[in-house]
Amino acid sequence: MYIYMNIEKIFSIALKTWPIGNSFAINTNILETNLINLGVVLAILVYFGKGILSNLLENRKQNILSTIRDAEQCYQEAAAKLKQAKLRLEQAKLKADEIRIQGLAQLEREKLELIKAADEDSKRLEESKNVTIRFEQQRAIEQVRQQVSRLALERALETLNNSLNPDLQARIIDNHIGLLRTIEGVTES
């Protein structure tokens, strides 16, 4: 900024002091053209402006280097965070696969247990059905036996009542009494 202002002052002074002519020509007179003055002014500008310009450039260089260092540090931190995030992602994927495999294994175990329980229930029901059928068969057979026995007794009584006369009844009673006496005699001895 300082240099720019100095150059501007120099040109404004030069324009005020040098008349602008209608034609263009090269003046070779060193004193008239103020080449010495211009050389001195340029030398002063270079001498004093060099320090200012080099300071400005050095400051700019330091700012740029600092910005680059900060950017590199941010990049390294971001790269480290990215690496950690990728590692966590891989761990999460492994854990998800492990959970999925465990879930499938658990599902298969439960499926087998349900099939086994259903088979056992089916066997128990089949056995219960067979027991019930056997029980009902036994009961039906027993009922048939009882009915057959009752009918046989009824027919026997009917036959006895029809064929029994008082003489036959007396002989049967005497026969049974004789049998009882024989049994008593055997048991007493």
UniProtKB/Swiss-Prot annotation:
UniProt keyword annotation of NAD present: no
Residue spans crossing the bilayer: 35-57
GO CC terms in record: chloroplast thylakoid membrane; proton-transporting ATP synthase complex
Subunit record text: F-type ATPases have 2 components, F(1) - the catalytic core - and F(0) - the membrane proton channel. F(1) has five subunits: alpha(3), beta(3), gamma(1), delta(1), epsilon(1). F(0) has four main subunits: a(1), b(1), b'(1) and c(10-14). The alpha and beta chains form an alternating ring which encloses part of the gamma chain. F(1) is attached to F(0) by a central stalk formed by the gamma and epsilon chains, while a peripheral stalk is formed by the delta, b and b' chains.
Function: F(1)F(0) ATP synthase produces ATP from ADP in the presence of a proton or sodium gradient. F-type ATPases consist of two structural domains, F(1) containing the extramembraneous catalytic core and F(0) containing the membrane proton channel, linked together by a central stalk and a peripheral stalk. During catalysis, ATP synthesis in the catalytic domain of F(1) is coupled via a rotary mechanism of the central stalk subunits to proton translocation. Component of the F(0) channel, it forms part of the peripheral stalk, linking F(1) to F(0).
Protein name from the UniProt record: ATP synthase subunit b, chloroplastic
GO molecular function ontology, one term from the record: proton-transporting ATP synthase activity, rotational mechanism
Subcellular compartments: Plastid, Chloroplast thylakoid membrane
Membrane topology: Single-pass membrane protein
Superkingdom, natural source: Eukaryota
Family: Belongs to the ATPase B chain family.
HAMAP family per the UniProt record, alphabetical: ATP_synth_b_bprime (MF_01398)
One Pfam assignment: ATP-synt_B
Further remarks about this protein from its record: In plastids the F-type ATPase is also known as CF(1)CF(0).
Keywords on record: ATP synthesis, CF(0), Chloroplast, Hydrogen ion transport, Ion transport, Membrane, Plastid, Thylakoid, Transmembrane, Transmembrane helix, Transport
